[in-house]
Amino acid sequence: MASLRRVKVLLVLNLIAVAGFVIFLAKCRPIAVRSGDAFHEIRPRAEVANLSAHSASPIQDAVLKRLSLLEDIVYRQLNGLSKSLGLIEGYGGRGKGGLPATLSPSEEEKAKGPHEKYGYNSYLSEKISLDRSIPDYRPTKCKELKYSKELPQISIIFIFVNEALSVILRSVHSAVNHTPTHLLKEIILVDDNSDEEELKAPLEEYVHKRYPGLVKVVRNQKREGLIRARIEGWKAATGQVTGFFDAHVEFTAGWAEPVLSRIQENRKRVILPSIDNIKQDNFEVQRYENSAHGYSWELWCMYISPPKDWWDAGDPSLPIRTPAMIGCSFVVNRKFFGEIGLLDPGMDVYGGENIELGIKVWLCGGSMEVLPCSRVAHIERKKKPYNSNIGFYTKRNALRVAEVWMDDYKSHVYIAWNLPLENPGIDIGDVSERKALRKSLKCKNFQWYLDHVYPEMRRYNNTIAYGELRNNKAKDVCLDQGPLENHTAILYPCHGWGPQLARYTKEGFLHLGALGTTTLLPDTRCLVDNSKSRLPQLLDCDKVKSSLYKRWNFIQNGAIMNKGTGRCLEVENRGLAGIDLILRSCTGQRWAIKNPIK
C-alpha cells in the first residue's frame, strides 16, 4: 500500500506542475491555428520523448520531458508488482506478436512438470510478457468500420480453478489493454475454489494494486463447476453487458466495439467472438478459419461451416449465424441473460450448457452469432481441471437438455449415448423448473430449431432399435465397426461405445457406428452383403447400388437375414483362433439388440 500511495502522490504533484507549465505556456505564447493546420494525434508513451527533439520551445520541451519522466516513474512502480511475482510486463520479449516462444534445454527440463500439471507450458508462460501483442486476424473490412462512442459498458468475467497465475494475469492485462476504458465497466475473477496459494493473496494483492477499483475477485467456498461459477460471476456484475471468458485467453485490438454494437442494436443477441488458437506448448497464436459452432447428438460441441447464405454474401466480415457455441467465450446483455434463465444451475461441472444456451436463445426469441470482426485467442489445454469423470457429467447434462428442450428428438441423445429411453441409470435431477421456464417464455418447438437454425443436423427418426448387438452363440462379444479403413464389420469384446452402436431402421437398414452430425460430414455406414464375400461389409449407404444388399430382415431374438441374398449374419467359432463374423446360409443363430423402441 505504501508504494501505491507514493505513486498517487507523484501523480498529483507532477500533474500540478504540468498544469502550471501549460497555463504559463498559454499566457506567454498564444498560438493562432491557421486554416489548414492539423492538430497532432496523441501518441503512445514511447513516442512522447521523441517529440521533444522537434519542439520549437524550451518550455514545451521541458513539459514533454516531464510528462515522459512521469510516465516512466509510474510504469516502473507498477511493473515492480509483476516482478515480485516473477512475471514480466511490457510489449517486447519472447512470444511478441504471437510468435512461438522457446526455452533453453535446461529450461525445458524444468518446464515438464508444470506443463503436465496445467495442460499448457506454464513455465514458458512466466517468461512471456503479460502485455505481449498478438496478430490481428480480423478481415480487412473490419478494421475500417466505425462504431458509436455511446456503446453499453461490459463486465468481463473470467472463471478459473487452479490455473497458472501468469496465464490468468495475461488474460486480465489483455482485456484492459484492448478494451476502451469508457466501455470497460469492470473485470470479475471467479475463483472456483482453487487450491494453489499463488491464486489467493498474491493474485488479489496484484490486481487490486495494478488496477485499483477495476477488478473484483469472487471466491466460491466449494468447487461448483464452470456452469455455476459463471452464474456467480453474473450475480456480481453491474455492467449492462456481460462477457464470459475462460481465464486463458488474449484479446485482439478492436474486439469489443463490434460486439457491443451488435448487442446495442438488439439486446436479445448473444455474440461469440471468433476464436483463434494459442498453442499450449509454445504460445504461438494461430488463426482459425471463420466458423459457426455446432454439436453432435451427444452434445459435444464442434466447429462447423458457416451457413450457405453467409458464403453467398461474399463478405467475411458479416456475422455468422450459429446454432450453439463452443463455450470458451460469449457476450450477452446482462438483463436478457437473466430473463432467459441464465445457464442451467442443475447441471454439474460443464458440458451441455453451451448447447442448452444456444437452443434456448433461438427458441425463446433471441439469436446467436459468431462475429469475425471480434477475435479472441484461446489456449486449448491438453488437460482440464475438471477432468475426473467429465464424460459422466457431460452425459448427465446432455440428458437434461434433451428432456427440457428437444421434444420428440430427445431420443437422438439417448441413442447417441447408447442409453435406454426409460430408466437410463442416470439421475438427471429435477427439470420441472426448466420446463416451466420454457413454458413461461412461450418458446418455439425443437422442430422449428432444426428446420430454421440447424438444418445441417442429421436426423434419425426412422430408428426402431439401437445399442449393442449380440449373438446367442457368443454373448461376450458385440458387433463392432472395426478399423475404419477395412470397411468390414467384426466381433469385439462388448464396451458399448460408438463403434458398437448398432441401429436398425424402418427401412431395414442396419447401421453401425456413432451417429453422424451434419450433412457435410460422413454418416454412419450400413452393413452390406455384396453376395460375393463371406465377410459383411460396412459401406456408405448412398453408394450401395443394390438396395436389397443393404436391407435386412430382423426381429428381436431372431436371425439377421439379408433381403438380397438370403444369407444370414452369423458367428463362426474357430477354437483357439477366435470367433469370426461371417455371412452364410442360415443355421438358426439369434441376435438381440439392447434397446428396442416401443
Swiss-Prot record:
**Which annotated residues bind substrate?**
192, 223, 381, 386
Q: Name the pathway it acts in.
A: Protein modification; protein glycosylation
State if Transmembrane is listed as a keyword.
yes
- Annotated residues for binding of Mn(2+): 246, 248, 378
Domain of life from the UniProt record: Eukaryota
The UniProt keywords, alphabetically, are: Disulfide bond, Glycoprotein, Glycosyltransferase, Golgi apparatus, Lectin, Manganese, Membrane, Metal-binding, Signal-anchor, Transferase, Transmembrane, Transmembrane helix
Q: Where is this region: Catalytic subdomain A?
A: 151-262
Q: Which PROSITE patterns match?
A: RICIN_B_LECTIN
- Domain Ricin B-type lectin: where? 465-594
Q: Which parts of the sequence are annotated with region: Catalytic subdomain B? A: 319-381
Per the UniProt entry, the Enzyme Commission number(s) are 2.4.1.41
Q: Quick one: a GO cellular component term?
A: Golgi membrane
Q: Which family does it belong to?
A: Belongs to the glycosyltransferase 2 family. GalNAc-T subfamily.
**What the record says about its domains?**
There are two conserved domains in the glycosyltransferase region: the N-terminal domain (domain A, also called GT1 motif), which is probably involved in manganese coordination and substrate binding and the C-terminal domain (domain B, also called Gal/GalNAc-T motif), which is probably involved in catalytic reaction and UDP-Gal binding. The ricin B-type lectin domain binds to GalNAc and contributes to the glycopeptide specificity.
Q: What name does the UniProt record give this protein?
A: Polypeptide N-acetylgalactosaminyltransferase 17
State the organism of origin.
Mus musculus
Gene that codes for this? Galnt17
